[in-house]
Regions:
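Metallocofactor- and cofactor-centric catalytic cores in central/energy metabolism, strongly enriched
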Residues: 7-231, 235-247, 261-269, 362-455
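A generic structural signal for short, non-catalytic loop/turn and secondary-structure boundary residues
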Residues: 84-86, 170, 272, 344-346, ...
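Short, mixed-charge, low-aromatic patches
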Residues: 198-202, 219-229, 306-309, 332-342, ...
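Histidine/cysteine- and/or acidic
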Residues: 227, 251-254
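Short flexible/disordered coil segments
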Residues: 233-248, 287-298, 315-324, 342-355, ...
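Conserved anion/nucleotide-ligand pocket segment
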Residues: 253-255, 259-324
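Glycine-rich, aromatic-lined ligand/substrate-binding cores of catalytic
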Residues: 309-399
Length: 455
């Protein structure tokens, strides 16, 4: 793989020129109204009241460079491109338990009772619709608040009815769906997932190979709503739904929010490769006690997460190019469910490296993080960027949003980029392009080098 940071992602097909402004309010549809979703919703309302700041959100905090040479300037992302405003978001969603967003947020324990008391009214009015659930895909959960239907196609149509009613009731013309549900068991695309026709036949025939997340994704796309997959399981990543997204002109992205330990890997590993330091092994373990940890305590769901977390190092280190440095390293990933820790995830990494004359060294990382606190701003950014992509006429897989995912979906057979800094450049260069600014390149460096050359 050519690793030049100037490489651009495949630009999704444009349906029209220009970007429609974000007029009116924006609907946010969330399958899985749990800790992440309620932390997001509470946070948006608290920030609006001046009781918190949106740290972790690029759309709300980051400024990027535009121009070059003697015309360098930094502009906030939200000022560079036309984004919706947090105050314009209208939330709705599904869950397999009936508690409203305030009750769920209290049970999750991510935010203090004092903080939640200030937004109780805003949270209590958000009651989830009955969810689509299949326990064979999430074995450690039970659902009491679920939809029933004669077929999976009937369930998809029921979701479409929910979406359309939500849009009408709230006078919305635009919406985005972000999967915040639990990790489903590991699966790979099969014959049924290859074409839209075979997939729809499978919906009608109640095919076991169709997971609930795929039903949500299908319903979302059929209603013209962009879909982002925050979990490691397959949903819009199957050929049938990629085809549907392209046919309908809808933006999709995924998969698996990059929040804690994997984020740190995609920061540290590029540094090791850049310095040509060898790697003997990378041992990673986590403890977490929230519902995500409970779900991942099942081997099927854990495998989906393990595959997602394990593939980043090879992509970054390129052992095929550097077999002496990275050709034979050991990589171990584990997650342990530890209920007392709740949403406060802790990750330990032991990294055995080699330097000059093969001399051994170690790096130790102890990351005490808060899962939903890291995930909420990712969801917020994806809401705004997926809406931007849709208004800009970008359809299909949004490779430029790889920055937010552990296992980025790709529009073709290429392997995804995992280097966080390259991913960030891909994202910001897409924003520059949409703003009709020049993409960041090497021109400034080249001019500076020219000045240093003695003729």
């Amino acid at each position: 793989m050519n690793r030049s940071p100037m490489n651009k992602p495949t630009t999704p097909q444009k349906q029209s020129t220009g970007i429609a402004p974000p007029q009116g309010r924006l609907g946010v549809l969330i399958p899985g109204m749990g800790a992440v979703a309620t932390t997001l919703i509470a946070g948006v309302n608290l920030i609006a009241k001046g009781q918190g700041r949106p740290f972790g959100s690029l759309t709300q905090m980051q400024k990027i460079q535009i121009g070059h040479c003697n015309d360098l300037r930094f502009v906030a992302i939200k000022d560079l491109v036309h984004l919706a405003e947090p105050r314009d978001l209208v939330f709705g969603g599904w869950d397999i338990t009936p508690e409203n967003a305030y009750q769920t947020a209290c049970d999750a324990g991510v935010l203090s009772q004092d903080m939640l008391a200030d937004v109780r009214q805003e949270l209590e009015v958000i009651t989830p619709w009955r969810g689509v659930f299949d326990q064979s895909y999430v074995r450690n959960l039970m659902g009491s608040h679920v939809k029933t239907g004669a077929s999976k196609m009937d369930l998809a149509k029921a979701l479409m009815d929910d979406i359309r009613k939500f849009l009408v009731d709230n006078d919305l013309e635009r919406a985005v769906m972000v999967w915040c549900g639990s990790t489903e068991v590991y699966s790979e695309p099969g014959p049924l997932h290859q074409t839209l026709e075979s997939f729809e036949r499978g919906l009608r025939d109640n095919a076991a190979e169709i997971a609930p997340s795929m039903i949500y994704a299908y319903a979302s796309l059929m209603c013209g709503v962009p879909f982002a997959n925050g979990a490691p399981n397959l949903s819009t990543e199957i050929p049938a739904l990629i085809d549907l997204a392209n046919r309908k002109g809808i933006a999709i992205s995924g998969r698996d929010f990059k929040t804690g330990q994997t984020m740190m890997k995609t920061i540290i590993a590029p540094g090791l490769r850049t310095r040509m330091l060898g790697l003997e092994g990378w041992f990673s373990t986590n403890i977490i006690g929230n519902k995500d940890g409970e779900v991942l305590n099942d081997s099927g769901s854990f495998k989906a997460k393990e595959v997602s977390k394990s593939q980043v190092l090879d992509s970054i280190l390129q052992p095929d190019l550097y077999p002496e440095l990275y050709g034979d390293y050991h990589h171990k990933v584990s997650i342990d469910y530890y209920p007392p820790r709740g949403d406060n995830k802790e990750g330990w990494d032991n990294i055995d490296i080699r330097g000059w004359l093969d001399q051994p060294m170690q790096i130790k990382v102890n990351f005490l993080c808060r899962d939903s606190i890291l995930a909420a701003p990712i969801v917020l950014d994806l809401i705004f960027f997926m809406d931007l992509a849709q208004r800009a006429g970008l359809q299909g897989v949004q490779e430029w949003l790889s920055f937010y995912y552990k296992s980025p979906a790709m529009p073709d057979s290429r392997k995804p980029e995992h280097d966080l800094f390259v991913q960030h450049l891909m994202l910001t260069n897409m924003l520059r392009t949409l703003a009709e600014e020049e993409a960041l390149d090497q021109s400034d460096l080249s001019e500076n080098v020219e000045k240093l050359i003695v003729r």
